[in-house]
C-alpha cells in the first residue's frame, strides 16, 4: 500500500487528471487505488494478467492497456486522440519504460517512479519526446517515506472503508511453517498470484 500510494504522490495526481499506471502488480494496483482516491479522471492501467486486470478495474481503472496487444504508447495516444496523459506512475517495467512514460506524457506532465531499476548503466530519455528539454516534463522517483503519521493516515483509509486491500490477497496461509511456500510464490510469480499472506 505505501509504495503504490507514494507513486501517486510523486506524480502529484490531482482531481480530473488523466493518468497512466504502468505495471499492475501489488504496487501498481495500490497506485491505481491512490490515483482514484486523489480524483483522477481517466485512469489507464497497463498490464495483462487477468486477475490483476480485474483488480485494477475494481480499484478505479477506467481503461486497461494490454502490452501484449501492441505498443503501450500507441494505445495511449490512440485512446487520447494523440494528446497523451497528464501524469504517469511507473510501478513496473524496465529501463525502457521511461522512454514510454516520457513519450505518453503531455507537456507539463509529471512522472512518479516507484519501480526499482536495478540493471543497466543508463536510463534513456527520448530527446524530442521530452521536448528537447523544454517540455516541462518532470520525473520524480524515490523510496516511500515512513513514519508513524504517514502509516496512521494509510490505516485510516482501511479503517473507514475507503480502501479494501482484500483484492490483493490471492494466496492465504496459516502458520509460520508456510513462510517458505509463500516466499517461493513471490519468487516464481504464478499467473494467479497477486500477493500471498501468512497469518501467524
What do these predicted regions represent?
Residues 99-103, 147-200:
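C-terminal hydrophobic helical "lid"/dimerization subdomain
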Residues 1-70, 74:
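Mid-domain Rossmann-like dinucleotide-binding core that forms the NAD(H)/NADP(H) cofactor-binding site
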Residues 83-89, 109-110:
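Short SAM/SAH-binding signature in class I
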Residues 72-82:
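Conserved amphipathic alpha-helix within the SDR
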Residues 114-115:
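Acidic carboxylate diad motif detector
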Residues 105-107:
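Helix-to-beta-strand junctions that scaffold the AdoMet/dcAdoMet cofactor pocket
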Residues 90-100:
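Beta-loop-alpha module in the N-terminal Rossmann-like domain of NAD(P)-dependent dehydrogenases
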Residues 109-110, 125-168:
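Rossmann-fold dehydrogenase core element
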Amino acid at each position: 500500500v505505501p509504495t503504490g500510494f507514494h507513486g501517486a504522490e510523486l506524480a502529484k495526481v490531482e482531481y480530473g487528471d488523466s493518468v497512466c499506471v504502468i505495471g499492475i502488480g501489488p504496487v501498481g494496483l495500490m497506485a491505481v487505488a491512490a490515483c482514484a482516491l486523489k480524483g483522477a479522471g481517466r485512469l489507464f492501467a497497463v498490464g495483462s494478467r487477468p486477475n490483476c486486470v480485474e483488480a485494477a478495474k475494481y480499484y478505479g481503472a477506467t481503461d486497461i492497456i494490454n502490452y501484449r496487444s501492441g505498443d503501450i504508447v500507441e494505445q495511449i495516444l490512440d485512446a487520447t486522440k494523440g494528446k497523451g496523459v497528464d501524469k504517469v506512475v511507473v510501478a513496473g517495467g524496465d529501463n525502457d519504460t521511461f522512454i514510454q512514460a516520457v513519450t505518453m506524457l503531455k507537456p507539463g506532465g509529471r512522472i512518479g517512479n516507484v519501480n526499482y531499476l536495478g540493471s543497466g548503466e543508463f536510463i534513456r530519455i527520448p530527446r524530442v519526446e521530452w521536448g528537447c528539454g523544454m517540455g516541462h516534463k518532470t520525473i520524480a522517483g524515490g523510496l516511500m517515506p515512513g513514519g508513524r503519521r504517514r502509516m496512521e493516515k494509510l490505516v485510516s483509509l482501511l479503517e473507514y472503508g475507503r480502501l479494501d486491500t482484500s483484492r490483493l490477497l490471492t494466496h492465504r496461509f496459516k502458520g509460520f511453517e508456510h513462510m517458505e511456500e509463500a516466499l517461493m510464490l513471490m519468487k516464481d510469480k504464478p499467473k494467479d498470484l497477486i500477493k500471498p499472506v501468512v497469518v501467524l
